[in-house]
Amino acid sequence: MKPDRLNALTDGVVAIAITIIVLELPLPEAPTLTGLRAVAPMLLTYLLSFINIGIFWNNHHHMLSTAEHVDGRVLWANLVLLFFLSLMPFVIRWIDEAGFEALPCAAYGIVLVGAALSYQALEAAIIRLHGRDGALARALGSDLKAKLSALAYGAAIGLAFVDPTIAIAIYVMIAAAWLVPDPRIEHQQIAEHRPRPDKDG
């Protein structure tokens, strides 16, 4: 099976999740700077969530560009990733209703670590399908950055019960680390399509 339908489904779910989040944003109670400041924390949380979803979507796009075809394992791994991304509006609304308390902030981290681990499972499924000599396996190597990010999310979940602001700070730092698109896959694809020198020339 070609990955086109998988990409289309992912694009649709991501677009819906982002739309739901922005529709759930509270409006300022007064048309003043004071009213805007009152909802500023939720606006920043929306921004962080938008960036996180965008990071997963961007990297997913690059990852799927290496797949010539997909199988059942890839389809299910992708569905698990979409499940966690689709939970983002739920945890954002919980934070809006409850405030930046320990449990909602920890739940935000659980969604992020779930998305991170399912993304890695999707990577593994594609590598299993295309082999260790496939473009994705050669581009990623050990993928230490992704593994460290998942560990950091796990630490943030625990720290949310100590101080939720520490957890939020960790979420922001991880997002900042991934804000620049990972160039490894693009570099690998460029290298594969670079014309080889003519030995007879």
Locate each region found by the language model:
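Multi-pass alpha-helical transmembrane bundle typical of ion/small-solute transporters
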Residues: 1-201
